[in-house]
Amino acid sequence: MDIFSWQLGLPSTLACLVFGYLLGSIPFGLILTRMAGLGDVRKIGSGNIGATNVLRTGNKKLAATTLLLDALKGTAAAAIASLWGVEAGMAAGLAAFLGHLFPVWLSFKGGKGVATYIGVLLGLVPVMVLLFAAAWLAVAKISRYSSLSALVATAIIPVALYATGNGKVALLFAVMTLIAWVKHRANIQRLMSGTESRIGEKG
């Protein structure tokens, strides 16, 4: 199969992109912290709306819920659209990922996309979530850096997908990985300077 071929028609592709983007742009971290009376999560820690920064509020249950919902919006977008074929699922999944990163409701300033990345992976190639989790947990146990764990895990996934014959999906996740790394550029700089916050720290 040509990994660069695209059989899905333009109207269907656009519909999947819009559906995925709108679903992915729901800022669950911000919504949940405000509902819990914890204020604006963008004003603490890294300023991110994702689960890692929500954890810095000290509310582990809220952080876990944010992680779950941010992942599920990626899963829902990819899985529902996949009923019309893998390309539809890929389009919706990518759009959900981008929606989380650049939500229209927050002036296009969103999260870094790791949870939604996992969710899209679950919706398209579920077994690969086990590899992602294993890589993330191994690096986290050794380093206590959530960002480094995510960077390593996202780097592994496209390679593993390609090696197992999922070339087209591997290309999708290579693009998503590149975007995720760009969104983590400040984390990469802090990792290099030794100033990155470790898991469990509020700073």
From Swiss-Prot:
Pathway(s) annotated for this protein in UniProt: Lipid metabolism; phospholipid metabolism
Major place of residence: membrane
EC number(s) recorded for this UniProt protein: 2.3.1.275
Keywords recorded for this protein, A-Z: Cell inner membrane, Cell membrane, Lipid biosynthesis, Lipid metabolism, Membrane, Phospholipid biosynthesis, Phospholipid metabolism, Transferase, Transmembrane, Transmembrane helix
Record membrane topology: Multi-pass membrane protein
SMART domains: G3P_acyltransf (SM01207)
Transmembrane segments: 13-33, 66-86, 88-108, 118-138, 156-176
GO biological processes: phospholipid biosynthetic process
Matches recorded under PANTHER family: GLYCEROL-3-PHOSPHATE ACYLTRANSFERASE-RELATED, INNER MEMBRANE PROTEIN YGIH
Function field: Catalyzes the transfer of an acyl group from acyl-phosphate (acyl-PO(4)) to glycerol-3-phosphate (G3P) to form lysophosphatidic acid (LPA). This enzyme utilizes acyl-phosphate as fatty acyl donor, but not acyl-CoA or acyl-ACP.
Family membership noted in the UniProt record: Belongs to the PlsY family.
Subunit architecture: Probably interacts with PlsX.
Protein name listed in UniProt: Glycerol-3-phosphate acyltransferase
